[in-house]
């Protein structure tokens, strides 16, 4: 959609149409709502000032990029948002040439912009990378690694900082507003450049006084950090005022050096029910637009809620129980613990590396730390797991939420890899509950275990409820749940036990069922015994095949045939969990058919 010739009034009208379209679709499909509604004018102004055909548009996380999709030939397709086979909830180059880069995880955008700027410079092209990044992403160290190089090399990159939670200092009255306007003007930029040149030629004493005056002036604006890094700062400005945004972006584009534009926006803008309620409306399922009430009522407790309640009870009884989350207090279930035990449970922001490492000394000092984290985000702290936890062999427990297929968030969020990347780490112990009660036992085991460990559980509810009697975890011990006379053994791990059990219902042959419980260390004694009784083993685990559960079993070199139904070597697409599982051939009826082809 070419909006270059639109008037301000037409752009404002377009922004409202975009908001309405977003609200209409997200209320049906679910998705990221509040930040998306708040970023509409920012994205409209980006498309007005920059050339999406040639300038790299880079969205951090990109969950707020729905307006960008609507402006780039996906208005009609938008009905399929986050649906299987439809458009992604994040930027995706395979979906559109206007999506410069894949995104989904936080704080990568400025590094990408630096890389793009280097390529543009080497090719001697007239293009400008433009970044949209939220204030929450500014808590991650990678941002400052990128800013450090950007400020040194002075590549022309325009960064729009979308401050939608007031986490960066608020503007200080009329003076700050005045400075924000003046700092964006060509006059101010020219005077600043001349002043810098003048300072170089002043005597040392005069330079000192002048610099002190300059720093005093900076202190009344929030931009001193960026200025010290060598990046020009403009703002704060109103992120919903299209006239101001367009004027500011136009100036920034012409500056030919790195600049950060600090724009303040309101989350949920245009939908009164969501305005100001930051976390609740961040990511939502289908809801009634008129009331804001959710349309999906879960009948089973989620694994997250079970973990949260159990950890809360343990923390109430034992003051040595502590925990951390990286910007996901609600998603991981730590929110009530942070609220009631604020001196022992922390949200450190989008800082997975710091979250992991900071728990190590607590374990050494006699506390029992839990790192509550999504499978996909633990990847961001992997070196710290090895270097700072496993190498020290301290009792940090990793509660890995969203293990397996998570659904509509797609490739960047599926929890497929944790078994594969944690299993090779010396001193690490891996186990998984199969149902709500064994999840409670998993938390208890982790609390009392004094070495590094990790347990995984799914998004939403378990497949199993209470079909089998639950027993506490014992280190390295598996459990034979169903014993039959046949020579077929189903080996389940975590939620895979439920998948195996449901598959058994579609098979007439006698089948035995083993809950592996621990994938590291394995119950070698029991597995060796079972290898004498069962010739064919079928592995069920919501994890990657490469380096996964079946790989661990194969390493034992048992005299059995092993077939695994773990995830193949691919990135798993977005869509409702049941639709994705069907596409992968993982529904019970499909699995039963595959099993029958072997036995």
UniProtKB/Swiss-Prot annotation:
* Signal peptide start and end residues: none
Report whether Metal-binding shows up as a keyword of the record. Answer: yes
One GO BP on record is: thiamine biosynthetic process
Positions binding Mg(2+) in this chain are 135, 164
Q: Entry's HAMAP family? A: DXP_synth
**Which family does the record assign?**
Belongs to the transketolase family. DXPS subfamily.
Instruction: Give the protein's function.
Output: Catalyzes the acyloin condensation reaction between C atoms 2 and 3 of pyruvate and glyceraldehyde 3-phosphate to yield 1-deoxy-D-xylulose-5-phosphate (DXP).
Q: In which pathway does it act?
A: Metabolic intermediate biosynthesis; 1-deoxy-D-xylulose 5-phosphate biosynthesis; 1-deoxy-D-xylulose 5-phosphate from D-glyceraldehyde 3-phosphate and pyruvate: step 1/1
Which residues does the annotation say bind thiamine diphosphate? 63, 104-106, 136-137, 164, 271, 352
Q: What is this protein called?
A: 1-deoxy-D-xylulose-5-phosphate synthase
Tagged with keyword Magnesium:
yes
**UniProt remark on cofactor binding:** Binds 1 Mg(2+) ion per subunit. Binds 1 thiamine pyrophosphate per subunit.
Residue ranges annotated as coiled coil are none
Q: A Pfam family for this UniProt protein?
A: Transket_pyr
Q: Which SMART domains match?
A: Transket_pyr
């Amino acid at each position: 959609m070419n909006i270059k010739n639109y008037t301000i009034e037409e752009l404002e009208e377009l922004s409202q149409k975009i908001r309405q379209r977003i609200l209409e679709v997200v209320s049906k499909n679910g998705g990221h709502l509040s930040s998306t509604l708040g970023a509409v004018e920012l994205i409209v102004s980006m498309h007005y000032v920059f050339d999406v055909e040639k300038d790299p548009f880079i969205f951090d996380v990109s969950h707020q990029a729905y307006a960008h999709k609507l402006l780039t030939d996906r208005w009609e397709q938008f009905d399929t948002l986050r649906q299987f086979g439809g458009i992604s909830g994040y930027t995706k180059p395979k979906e559109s040439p206007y999506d410069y880069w894949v995104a989904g995880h936080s704080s990568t955008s400025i590094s990408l912009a630096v890389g793009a700027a280097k390529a543009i410079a080497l090719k001697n092209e007239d293009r400008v990378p433009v970044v949209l990044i939220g204030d929450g992403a500014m808590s991650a160290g990678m941002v400052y690694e990128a800013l450090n190089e950007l400020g040194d090399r002075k590549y022309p990159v325009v960064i729009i900082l979308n401050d939608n939670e007031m986490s960066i200092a608020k503007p200080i009255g009329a003076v700050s507003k005045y400075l924000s306007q003046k700092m964006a003007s060509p006059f101010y930029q020219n005077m600043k450049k001349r002043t810098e040149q003048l300072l170089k030629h002043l005597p040392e004493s005069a330079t000192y006084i002048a610099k002190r005056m300059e720093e005093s002036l900076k202190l009344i604006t929030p931009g001193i950090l960026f200025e010290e890094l060598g990046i020009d700062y403009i703002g704060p400005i109103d992120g919903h005022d299209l006239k101001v945004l367009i004027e500011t972006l136009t100036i920034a584009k012409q500056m030919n050096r790195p600049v950060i534009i600090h724009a303040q926006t309101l989350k949920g803008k245009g939908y009164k029910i969501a305005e100001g309620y930051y976390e609740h409306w961040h990511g939502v399922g289908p809801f009634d637009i008129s009331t804001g009430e959710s349309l999906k009522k879960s009948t089973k407790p989620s694994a997250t809620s079970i973990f949260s309640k159990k950890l809360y009870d343990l923390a109430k009884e034992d003051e040595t129980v502590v925990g951390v989350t990286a910007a996901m207090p609600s998603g991981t279930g730590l929110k009530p613990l942070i609220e009631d035990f604020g001196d022992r449970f922390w949200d450190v922001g989008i800082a997975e590396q710091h979250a992991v490492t900071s728990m190590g000394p607590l374990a050494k000092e006699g506390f029992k730390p839990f790192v509550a984290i999504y499978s996909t985000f633990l990847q961001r702290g992997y070196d710290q797991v090895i270097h700072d936890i496993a190498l020290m062999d301290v009792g940090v427990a990793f509660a890995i939420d969203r293990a397996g297929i998570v659904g509509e968030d797609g490739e960047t969020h599926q929890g497929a890899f944790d078994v594969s990347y944690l299993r090779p780490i010396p001193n690490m112990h891996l186990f998984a509950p199969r149902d709500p009660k064994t999840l409670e036992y998993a938390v208890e085991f982790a609390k009392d275990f004094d070495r590094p460990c990790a347990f995984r559980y799914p998004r939403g509810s378990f497949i199993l409820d209470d079909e089998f009697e639950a027993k506490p975890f014992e280190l390295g011990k598996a459990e034979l749940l169903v014993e039959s006379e046949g020579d077929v053994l189903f080996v389940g791990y975590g939620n895979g036990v439920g998948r195996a059990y449901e598959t058994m219902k579609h098979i007439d042959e006698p089948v035995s069922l083993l809950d592996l419980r621990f994938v590291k260390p394995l119950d070698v004694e029991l597995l060796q015994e079972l290898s004498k009784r069962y010739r064919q083993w079928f592995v069920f685990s919501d994890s990657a095949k490469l380096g996964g559960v079946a790989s661990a079993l194969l390493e034992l070199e048992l005299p059995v045939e092993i077939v695994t139904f773990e995830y193949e070597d691919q990135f798993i697409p977005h869509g409702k969990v049941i639709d994705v599982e069907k596409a992968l051939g993982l529904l019970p009826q499909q699995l039963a058919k595959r099993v029958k082809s072997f036995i």
